[in-house]
Amino acid sequence: MPPKQAPSKKAENKRKEKVIEDKTFGLKNKKGNKNQKFVAQIENQVRNNNTRMDLVRQQEAAKKKEKDELLDIQNLLKPVEQKVAKDVDPKSLLCVFFKQGLCGKGAKCKFSHDLAVAQKTAKKNLYADSREVEKDETNENWDKEKLDEVVNKKNKGGHVIDIVCKYFLEAVENNKYGWFWECPNGGDKCQYRHCLPEGYVLKKDRKAMEAQKEDEISIEELVEKERAALNSKDLTKLTLQTFVAWKKKKLKERKEKEEADLKAKKEKIKSGKHNGMSGRDLFLFDANLINNDDDEAGDIEMEKEEVDENEKVFEIDANFFKFDGMDDELTNQMSNSTAAVSSVAGAVAKMDINEDLFDIDEDVGDLDSDSDED
């Protein structure tokens, strides 16, 4: 008789689950620590043939470590994927893996497997005539036909004219110029140049530049446009009058603030509170507080700042903030002081001065002679 077949793995696992369920009936839902340990022990005995739990955990940790190491090696040996811009056709680029003989995608590869694709996609230079002989080219590699061609061209005077070929310009404007384009005026024997001069702008590019200039606006127009977009009801238009009024308001506020701070500092010093006061404030209000502060501090020395007599200073007088339709207390004060000075000067001018009082030359001479005699 043939031997009995061993039970399948699926049937064996089902049997083990049945045994575990029978032995742990009513214990899985209990949250006690002892019950949970007992359930885990029963599951280990049935599933792992009574293998120790710590050995099972060690085996699982070893498998996980081996898997992680394999994953790290794969990441290190993973080739760099070739990238391409969105607006570039991948078939116009050579596959870097195919160039090294490593690409296994074959026809499914999105990059080109043609080694000459770079030459096919390269555009012909519009600013260099391909017919012109290079500067470093010599007659060492010329054959008999090339030599005869050069001699005949020199004898006939068939030199290239500096004028650009009209057929070349037409082909460039219509995007027909390329590696396989031939000039209708004799092909390579055309005496006109087949290259654009330096700085030349094509008509199609010129139109695009003009259209772009039309869309552009000057900085003045941009400023006016942004100003027009603002809500004029909530904002004040900036003029000379509004600026001067704002400046005077700020000066007045600054003066009031300085007076208030000065008053607060005076009250603070009177009350004997010097905390938070700078040395300059203490010296201005009461210099004795500084002089008598410490006898061992030494004498107080002050250095006078040097003033450059040739330095020009921008003076701001009452006329700087003056304009029609605006009251100015500073103007009134200065006008009153000016009138007072002028009245005093007029009174002094009208006074009778006895010039004999200042004629002391003779007396001075007598004094000098007396001193000499002594």
Curated annotation (Swiss-Prot):
Q: Which GO terms describe its biological process?
A: cytoplasmic translation
The cross-references to Pfam families, in alphabetical order and at most eight, read:
DFRP_C, zf-CCCH
Which controlled-vocabulary keywords does the entry list? Metal-binding, Repeat, Zinc, Zinc-finger
* SUPFAM superfamilies recorded: CCCH zinc finger (SSF90229)
Q: Which PROSITE patterns match?
A: ZF_C3H1 (PS50103)
One Gene Ontology molecular-function label: zinc ion binding
Q: Which domain of life is it from?
A: Eukaryota
Its GO CC terms are: cytosol
Enumerate the residue ranges forming zinc fingers (C3H1-type): 89-116, 167-197
Family stated for the protein in its record: Belongs to the ZC3H15/TMA46 family.
The protein, known as: Zinc finger CCCH domain-containing protein 15 homolog
Q: Which organism is it from?
A: Caenorhabditis briggsae
